[in-house]
Amino acid sequence: MSDLKSRLKETSNWMSSMFNIIKDPTSESASFSNRVNSVAPPPRRSSSSSSISFSELTNSNENKTTTTTTTTTTSTTATTSQPPQKSPVEQNKEELKKLLQQQLAEMKLKRQGKNSNINDSNNSNNNNNNTDKNKNDNKKEIIKNKKIKEEEESEGEEVEEEEEEESDISDSEDNNSSNNNGSLNGDYDDYGDEISESGSEMDLINNKNLNKEKRKKQEEDLQFSTFDFSSGKAMPTYLMNKGRKTSKKELLEKAEEKERILANSKRNGTNKELADTIRWSTAFDKVQGIKVKDDPALLRKSIKKVEKTKLKSAREWVQRKKEKDEKLKVRIAKREANIKAKIEEKKERRMGIKKKKTNNNNNKSGGGGGNSHASRQRAGFEGKKKFHFNPKKLIN
């Protein structure tokens, strides 16, 4: 039993020395063997920290007797002596209670400070949320106005404006998310309203993108539905050649150059690659259905034909002009003669000279006189008929 007690004391001394090393780093100057063999000094107790040494607890359990001990409290100003009636266990309990009370008071103070900070942060976040709401309302009005403008403007301008709107909305959403994460006790109703508003804006943007895609598809359908290329028929040349039409003289020059290149390649063997490319290009054009005008003889013939038609139209134009001038001259002469005749009539009337009537039987047509043919021309003015229409009866 004595061996066990000695071992227990050694271990308790070693443990107490280790605790003292942790508390007082100055005790490290002593050697380890002295620290193990020596009895552990009583632990220092301050107002801020208190702990029970393992050796004191074991001694109190073995003896089970109340011993009076004097504890010294170190302070900066003065030393005080405690009443010697209390046991170390009771003292430790009281000190622990004091420490707990101090810690609780500190925690309360910290919580009060945190609550004040939280309230300040909540107020700032609420203000930010209100400003964000106003911004979102303004953005909605801007989006509505822009819709009306976008319908009138071109599609390119629509795309630019929508990209700007998307960037603005993404910035506002980032700000909202940062503010909501920073606030611990924010208003959840306001947060829900902001989410619904941002969601509605995103829905509008998605609908716009869908409408754009539909428009593009419709345009593509219009472009490729006007002509059915699935039939395998070649596209006509008047649709292929949208630019300026090349004249026949230019085509003749090109055809002559091609002939010259091909003839040189056959004779001398020069420019074989160029000749092959010319042949392949003409072959591909013919396969595609394009009219290849590379025959110089036919081109010369067509040029002569065009020149002949031009000469013919020029002659006809000159003749027409001559006839027009002659007719104009006749009309002018007739007009001048009529004007002169009217002037002479006026003069004769003033002089009192009466115009003699010319009796031309051929010109008479009414009153029963005159030619039978002239009397038949106007019905109702023939006068009395001296003959019948049937000449056979008259002969009989």
From Swiss-Prot:
Main location: nucleus
Biased composition (Polar residues): 27-37
Extent of Basic residues compositional bias: 385-396
GO molecular function, a single term: DNA binding
Amino acid composition bias (Low complexity), ranges on this chain: 46-55, 65-81, 114-131
Sequence ranges of Basic and acidic residues compositional bias: 132-150, 210-220, 341-351
Similarity comment text for this entry: Belongs to the SURF6 family.
Example of a GO biological process term: ribosomal large subunit biogenesis
Pfam family membership, one: SURF6
Protein name according to UniProt: Surfeit locus protein 6 homolog
Region (Disordered): 26-225, 341-396
Species lineage: Eukaryota, Amoebozoa, Evosea, Eumycetozoa, Dictyostelia
Subcellular location, record wording: Nucleus, Nucleolus
Species in which this protein is naturally found: Dictyostelium discoideum
GO cellular component terms, semicolon-separated: nucleolus
